[in-house]
UniProtKB/Swiss-Prot annotation:
This is Type III pantothenate kinase. One of its GO terms (biological process) is coenzyme A biosynthetic process. One of its GO terms (cellular component) is cytoplasm. The active site is at D108 (proton acceptor). Disulfide bonds: none annotated. Substrate binds at Y99, G106, A107, D108, R109, T184. It holds the Pfam family Pan_kinase. InterPro entries: ATPase_NBD, Type_III_PanK. ATP binds at D6, V7, G8, N9, S10, H11, I12, Y13, T132. K(+) binds at D129. It is an enzyme of class 2 (transferase). Keywords: ATP-binding, Coenzyme A biosynthesis, Cytoplasm, Kinase, Metal-binding, Nucleotide-binding, Potassium, Transferase. Catalyzes the phosphorylation of pantothenate (Pan), the first step in CoA biosynthesis.
Length: 256
């Protein structure tokens, strides 16, 4: 079985795959941890879910937090006796990356693109990842990673208001029933939610025409906040495990 780990800015997400089927999912707050803390956590979460650590044959990591990489890699070696695969510049992806400097593309965005083109071949695709940042990736039917857009995520937007103003509070991120808030909290929640929704609609329209000349596209959504937009007609498919699927596929592509 393969243990796939996605190190994000807010959390570490993980999954255990048996073939192409995901058997286990977990999450851990991604504040910088020691290798021992990470190793103990990984072994514990496996055992708690009736998955023996000894059944893990490969570990694959995708990270956008460099300060966690060394500790996590050390944990894999010390606690699993496995040198993990790291999705990074120079590995096989099956994509033709059109960034001016391909090294700049986040590993999570590459993982999403790998999984998207594998699950939906020969299609023009926009992937929206609703995480700490909300990211857009445009991938052509020929597997060309054309580029995309990045904007603050919902939580980041709300936190920016509470941290940089004297009187605005921290709020829960929800889909509000009314656009017109009748309290400060409701107004922030409305502004954050519908502001991101509006930005997404505009970006989809512009990417559709600029990257794909108006040709048919498929829109995929993933990330922790994606389900909040499930009834807005924003995307065609919600794929919660997209990045983990991409990590697994990348690891298989790079297996000697």
């Amino acid at each position: 079985m393969i243990l796939c780990i996605d190190v994000g800015n807010s959390h570490i997400y993980g999954g255990v795959f048996d073939g192409d089927e995901i058997k286990l999912r977990f999450r851990h707050t991604s504040k910088v941890s020691t290798s021992d803390e990470l190793g103990i956590f990984l072994k514990s979460v496996l055992r708690e879910n009736n998955c023996s650590p000894e059944t893990i044959r490969k570990i694959a990591i995708c990270s956008v937090v460099p300060q966690v990489d060394y500790s996590l890699r050390s944990a894999c070696v010390k606690y699993f006796s496995i040198d993990p695969f790291l999705l990074q510049a120079g590995v096989k992806t099956g994509l033709n990356i059109k960034y001016r400097n391909p090294v700049e593309v986040g590993a999570d965005r590459i993982a999403n693109a790998i999984a998207a083109t594998h699950s939906f071949p020969n299609q023009n695709i926009i992937v929206i990842d609703f995480g700490t940042a909300t990211t857009f990736c445009a991938i052509s039917h020929k597997k060309a990673y054309l580029g995309g857009a990045i904007l603050p995520g919902l939580r980041l937007s709300a936190d920016a208001l509470s941290k940089n103003t004297a009187k605005l509070p921290s709020v829960e991120i929800i889909k509000t029933e009314s656009v017109v808030g009748r309290s400060t909290i409701e107004s922030i929640q409305s502004g954050v939610y519908y502001g991101v929704l509006g930005a997404c609609k505009e970006l989809i329209q512009r990417i559709h025409h600029e990257a794909f000349n108006g040709d048919k596209i498929l829109i995929l959504a993933t990330g922790g906040f994606a389900s909040l937009f499930d009834k807005q007609g924003l995307y065609d498919h919600l794929v919660p495990d997209l990045v983990l699927q991409g990590i697994r596929l990348a690891a298989m592509m790079n297996t000697a």
